[in-house]
Amino acid sequence: MSKSKKKAETIFLVCEETGQYNYTLRKKPGGEKLRLKKYNPNLRKHTWHAEKKK
C-alpha cells in the first residue's frame, strides 16, 4: 500500500496593518507560518502579510 499524500490547503495572506485578505495561496500543511511583504492596493504600498487558515 502506498502512503497517503498530504493535500494542499488554501490559506489567506492577511495584511497586518489593515486586517484585509488580499491574497490566497495553496500550501502543503506543516512547516512555519508564512510572513511575506506583499503589495496592499488600498494603502498603495508594500506591507507585511501573515498566513491565516480558512
Curated annotation (Swiss-Prot):
HAMAP family referenced in this protein's UniProt entry, alphabetically: Ribosomal_bL33
Upper taxonomic lineage: Bacteria, Pseudomonadati, Planctomycetota, Planctomycetia, Pirellulales
Transmembrane stretches, start-end: none
Species the sequence originates in: Rhodopirellula baltica (strain DSM 10527 / NCIMB 13988 / SH1)
Gene Ontology terms: cellular component: cytoplasm; ribonucleoprotein complex; ribosome
InterPro entries reported in the protein's UniProt record: Ribosomal_bL33, Ribosomal_bL33_sf, Ribosomal_zn-bd
Protein name listed in UniProt: Large ribosomal subunit protein bL33
Pfam family, one: Ribosomal_L33
UniProt record similarity statement: Belongs to the bacterial ribosomal protein bL33 family.
Keywords linked to the UniProt accession: Ribonucleoprotein, Ribosomal protein
Any one GO BP annotation for this protein: translation
GO molecular function: structural constituent of ribosome
